[in-house]
């Protein structure tokens, strides 16, 4: 089942968001007709820190075709704190600041690190966990057996149906 974002609202929201490279100007990188991955981030969330390597690997594997963006909602984190997080974990991710939670609310995002894979028509093809490493908060699996986002990206590339379009995100609450 695809979740269709209201394109008008999506574009209006994106017009108000700001980028990490110049937080005083609107970020228009997402206002295009291409697929994209949005990762809800919080620099203090231990799970966001744990998944930085996975984000980098996915960006290496898919980033030429499908751009990745980090989304930092609210005003709790300064651009300096976000930049420090990106540098500490060597994460080459463009950041979209969402100070008024507009994008967060449009996506119905509640958790970091929650991921959204959105196609060129702004349909949400996948949302939720990166993988099944966490069975629940505080309980980790010994072995990952499901790579939800990676599998969704692979399916998209070959035009196949995405087997698992949604999982329940586990992590830190967006504040």
Regions found by a protein language model. Give the residues of each.
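Bacterial N-terminal signal peptides that target proteins for export
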Residues: 1-9
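Short, internal strand/loop/helix patches
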Residues: 86-119, 124-125
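Short active-site neighborhood of thiol/selenol oxidoreductases, capturing the structured segment around
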Residues: 31-49, 153
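Short, thiol/selenol-centered motifs that function as redox-active sites or metal-ligating centers
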Residues: 42-51, 75-76, 170-175
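Thiol-/selenol-based redox modules, centered on thioredoxin-like
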Residues: 119, 124-125, 129-175
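C-terminal motif of bacterial Sec signal peptides marking the signal peptidase cleavage site
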Residues: 16-19
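Bacterial signal peptide processing site
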Residues: 21-23
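Structural microenvironment flanking redox-active thiols in thiol-disulfide oxidoreductases
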Residues: 49-88, 99-106
